[in-house]
Each structure stands twice: as structure tokens, then as C-alpha cells.
Amino acid sequence: MTVFKNERLSWLPYIAIVILLHVIGFSFLWIAGKDHHILFGMGILAYTLGLRHAFDADHIAAIDNTVRKLLQQRKDPSGVGFYFSIGHSSVVFLMAVFLGVSVKWAKDELPHFQDIGGTIGTLVSGFFLVLIGVLNLIILISLINLFAKLRREHIEEAEVDALLESRGLVSRFVGPYFKLITRSWHVLPLGFLFGLGFDTASEIALLALSSGASQQAISFIGILSLPILFASGMSLLDTLDGVVMKYAYNWAFFNPIRKIYYNITITAISVMAALVIGMIELLQILADKLDLHGAFWAFIGSIEFDYLGYILVALFLITWLISSLIWKFGRIEHKWSR
């Protein structure tokens, strides 16, 4: 029995919206691309950039941590990935609209906004992930203590739930916003803040300018198709990430022993992911703004996040699989229940 036995298909509306985004994006691309064939290649590139950006390390860590938090509160997290990606991609869309009405302004000011926005977005992402990592570290210690207590004495499931939910009290130390995330849609503003780094927005915007034609070479619908396709690709994988993590975590909520056992495993991964990614982001900003040199800072600056997100996805899924196998063949539930 899962936590959300009556909400098995709660993810369907989000998938339907993602499909609608695909239909709109590719329809706009087809309409505008009939007159400018080069737009087809640009549209596919925009969609690919969206797919790739969904695997950014900060996306994966933020979505998976929020899914786990909502499940602990017995809230449905099916839309976490969807709303995060919509908030993030809305920055791209707004930038494309501005480009559509004022191409010259974008050409003159975009580099400046890219620098400022990139700093803001990275700082928000880094601080948020470090705070989440510290919170999860405290949670991990409490879980280990609770698991040891469960081996020594019998604990009712209601008591376990109360202990798990009481960990939320720690959230008062990490600022007011994370406490306010009690529904899937609450992560939409967070996704927007993460998106304020105009690196991805500028990629899509510059695609609209890369044809080398005059300002009227690509229609407004053609320009709009690029951020919509970008959002389609990113929302597809982010939504699937949130849904997959929901059902992976639901395995852990079958009984008290399994619940604590799995939470120890996945929380340890969450701590590592959030702290490592958050600290690297903040250290890279520090090194850049203070012009720091040396072997350590050179190593920090050389770290690329392009493949780290893929590793995190695999790590979460492998952790869930290994936990299931150890649980089954190690007979942990039987040993702890005696």
C-alpha cells in the first residue's frame, strides 16, 4: 500500500500539459519554418538544449529533495518536476518575447544581463542546495539514531511518522521559503529563481539571431517556437524525474522499518549531492569574483556540471534498486521485527 493509493494517476495532467507544449512548439516551428527552413535546425537544437538542461545537477538535486520532503508530509509530489521546469523555462520565454519586440535592445544589453543574471542564479542555486544539504545532514543523523532505537525496542508506525515529520522543525533555520513548499506548485517560483542565470535564456535568444538575416527574417511565431520547444524538452524530463522519484520513494513507506531504512539510504545521497553541488557553485562564484588563483581554485573552476546531473539521476535510481535488493535478500525487515 502506497502513501498515495488514490492518486496513482495524479501525474497524468502534467504529462498532458507537456504533450500540449510539444504540439504548440512544433506547430509554431512548422508554420514559421515553411518560409525559413533554417529554423527547423534551430528548433531541434532548442529542444535538445531543453532536454540537456533538465539534467543539470541543480535541477536533479532540487527536484528530488523536494519530492522527498513532500512525501514525508504525505503530500502528492507528482508535479514538482513539472512546476520547477515551468518556472525555470518561463525566464527563457520572457526573454524571447523581449527579443521579439526589441531585437536591437537585446543585442546591446544581453551580455550585461547574462553576467548579472548568471551570478544571481548561481548564488540562489548554491545557497539553496547548501541549506538543503545541511538540513538533510541533521535529518540523516536523527534517522540513524531512530533506526538504532527501532532495533532495540518496538515503535508504532504513528510514532515513526511523528518523529519523521518533526524533523520539519529544523526547516525554521533554513529560511522561510523552504518552509512554504508544501505543494508541488510551490516550487514554481524556485524554478524561476534558478532560471535567472541567463546562460540558457541567452542560448535560445541568440539562436533567434543566428540566422544572420535582417530583423524580419524570422517571424514572431518562429521566435516563440524556440523557447516553447526548450520548455517542452526540459519539462518532459523534469516531470518524469519527479514522477519516477515519487514511486521510488513510495516503496519506502510500506512499513516503519522500511521507511526508516530507505530514508537513511536516500538521505545520505541527498546530503552528498546537495552539499557538493552547492559548495562547488558558491566556490566557483567566489573564485571568479575575487580572482582567486592556485591549484585548488583551478580545480574548482575546471569542474563541469554537464555530466554531473546524469550521474545524479543514475545514483538515485541505483540507490533505490540496491536498497530494494538488500532489503529482500538481507531480510532486514525480518531481523528488525524479531
UniProtKB/Swiss-Prot annotation:
Top-level lineage group: Bacteria
Family named by the database record: Belongs to the NiCoT transporter (TC 2.A.52) family.
Swiss-Prot/TrEMBL induction comment: Transiently induced in response to mild-acid conditions.
InterPro entries, per the entry: Ni/Co_transpt (IPR004688), Ni/Co_transpt_high_affinity (IPR011541)
Key words of the record: Cell membrane, Ion transport, Membrane, Nickel, Nickel transport, Transmembrane, Transmembrane helix, Transport
Observed effect of gene inactivation: Deletion mutant is impaired in its capacity to accumulate nickel. Nickel accumulation and urease activity are almost completely abolished in a nixA-nikA double mutant.
Function: Secondary nickel transporter. Required for full urease activity.
Biological process according to GO: nickel cation import across plasma membrane
Membrane spanning residue stretches: 11-31, 37-57, 79-99, 127-147, 187-207, 217-237, 266-286, 307-327
Species whose genome carries this gene: Staphylococcus aureus (strain NCTC 8325 / PS 47)
Cellular location(s): Cell membrane
One Pfam family cited in the UniProt record for this chain: NicO
The protein, known as: Nickel transporter NixA
Coiled-coil intervals: none
One GO molecular-function entry: high-affinity nickel cation transmembrane transporter activity
Membrane topology: Multi-pass membrane protein
GO cellular component: plasma membrane
